[in-house]
Amino acid sequence: MRITNEVYVVGGGTNFGFGLSDDPDCHIYLIDTGDGLAIVDAGLGEGESISRITANILAEGLDLSDLKWLLLTHYHMDHVGGAAKLRDRFNLEVWAPADAAEVIRTGDEGPPSLTIAKSSGLYPMDFTFEPCGVDVELRDGDRLRLGNLELEVIDTPGHCHAHQSFLLHGRSRRYLFAGDAIFSGGRVVWQNIWDNNVQDTVASINKLATFDFDALCPGHAAVVVDGGKRHVEIAQRKVESLGLPASLV
């Protein structure tokens, strides 16, 4: 599903998504950098998800041989569970937050609270976290070439400990790939897990409000093509009045 001339949504389940791949996949974005294609987040990777993502890319008239990168925002399974499958299928270079890299490489199910998530019904009980190699460890403030475009890395903890958002300086606009740091309507996700932190969330909202961008591309729910920063400002006004942003779920 084409969003702009350089960004597509090629996956995502029906729960706060477009039904382009299996539940509970997050939005899976594809960036046409002008010199290669990049995927942002991998979904859970179960069922027919990988095949459906592949078919969606082909349906847009894109060449699978141009796929070069997989960018991961954080280590929750609906974003990273399918990373190893995508990496192996398309020989992708994987970029991930430095603080999440070892968890992803080893398939450590502790920090992502996978046992709790499975027992609560978020993921199948028989799901296991397949280790995935990480080629580039991303740190706050990194500015990297992504094909013909520039990508800026922003640490945005709060939803979980090792969470990053990516500011893409595109040809037509600037895009914030926010993962689960912020959603349309200024919403966040509050969860009873060890690293979901109120003060970190507030700090990340205030931090994101210092950046200029047009499009808000979150991990779930509505994608905002223009006026995306306004949704961060909604959350910022809430915390400035000593309140907390509403939860997406």
What are these regions (language model features)?
Residues 34-38, 63-67, 147:
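Short, surface-exposed connector motifs at secondary-structure boundaries
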